[in-house]
Amino acid sequence: MPTDMEHTGHYLHLAFLMTTVFSLSPGTKANYTRLWANSTSSWDSVIQNKTGRNQNENINTNPITPEVDYKGNSTNMPETSHIVALTSKSEQELYIPSVVSNSPSTVQSIENTSKSHGEIFKKDVCAENNNNMAMLICLIIIAVLFLICTFLFLSTVVLANKVSSLRRSKQVGKRQPRSNGDFLASGLWPAESDTWKRTKQLTGPNLVMQSTGVLTATRERKDEEGTEKLTNKQIG
């Protein structure tokens, strides 16, 4: 009986160790439970066969004495428990290195996948930031060019006004001040503007005024010439 208790205690200790190993490796727990179920079922069948054979042998040899049968069974039970303990030890020794060898590989694969995903995400973020920066730079360049063009256009208009005012100040006589539209029109169509002004001057009452002015000027010249001749005759 004490040997049976020792073997059962040893068996329970090994079972506790195996459960702790299972808890440490949840990824391979299902596979090992299948192996353990198969092994336990096979060993149970072996034990049942052995116990049945021993019982039959004991019954055939000593059918009258049940104590001998009990002793035989008691002597056979430690052997079976010892066999189960040895098999559990061998299975544990085979299983623990596989768990130890598989766990670092799984951890490394998880770390590699996480690193690869992180690197891909960083690359995507950097590419998006670069695209946004390029778009902003293009918009800034376009805005600067637009401002430069508007500044040049306004400066040309101002310079044109100054040049026209200088020309007007140099010209002799009084004329109507020309606007910016007139200056641009004369710059674009100078010949047409001159002909239009001439035709305007030679039509209507302007022509009459010009003709009367010319006639009066010729008469005054003739009168001056006549007076000069008369004075010359009187002196002579």
Curated annotation (Swiss-Prot):
It is a single-pass type I membrane protein. Residues 217-236 are annotated as: Disordered. One of its GO terms (cellular component) is cytosol. Glycans are attached at N31, N38, N49, N73, N112. One of its GO terms (molecular function) is transmembrane signaling receptor activity. It comes from the Eukaryota. Residues 1-30 form the signal peptide. It is found in: Membrane. May complex with itself or/and other proteins within the membrane, to function as part of a cell-surface receptor. This is Protein EVI2A. The lineage of its organism: Eukaryota, Metazoa, Chordata, Craniata, Vertebrata. The gene is EVI2A.
